[in-house]
Amino acid sequence: MRQRVMIAMALSCNPKLILADEPTTALDVTIQAQILELLRGLAKEFRTAFILITHALGIVAGMTQRVHVMYAGRIVEKADTVELFANPKMPYTWGLLRSIPRLDEQRKEKLLPIEGLPPDLISLPPGCKFEPRCQYRRDICREREPELIPVPNAKSDHEARCWGTQNVSGGGWLVDTDYRREVGDMRVLEEIKQEVASIHTESGPMTTA
């Protein structure tokens, strides 16, 4: 109910843009689906744009057109949703996708977490903020922070903040290409969309943005 009241308050001034910070936090899956459907209906009826801040990859896959991935207060990768899920170019993004359970596989091993802890925002390191936790780090990552630059040969507007993406021919930082394909697979995005749709059982079918 509180989320609905806040949405009503936000719409009272007929805004063109609404910033929704974790709009489904602490909700069960049924109420979560109803809130998401409400946001989608408002966007369609009033032509209101939404910026969703969320840690839920299912919401990202089912609700967004473009994604900005942030780490330690910085944008580390941005692309349209399909491109990002199919072709992640920053190790942090790749790590997030590795943590998604695959619905088409029977996993014998545990999901792989991102090791380590986020940096102290009061005393950030001079180089890449993800470097202490990155398994593909190199010396330059510790020394200087890379810029957010276009990914070579991307299918859409795609930028990443990673020295590996900039320096490797064609863009990319993974050596094990077979493992890379396992993560950057379009099935991952489709599975998340199906999972989001499956929880929407009371307020009608959910369409995907």
Predicted regions located by residue number:
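Short glycine/serine/threonine-biased micro-segments
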Residues: 6, 18, 24, 114, ...
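ABC nucleotide-binding domain signature
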Residues: 6, 51, 68, 127-129, ...
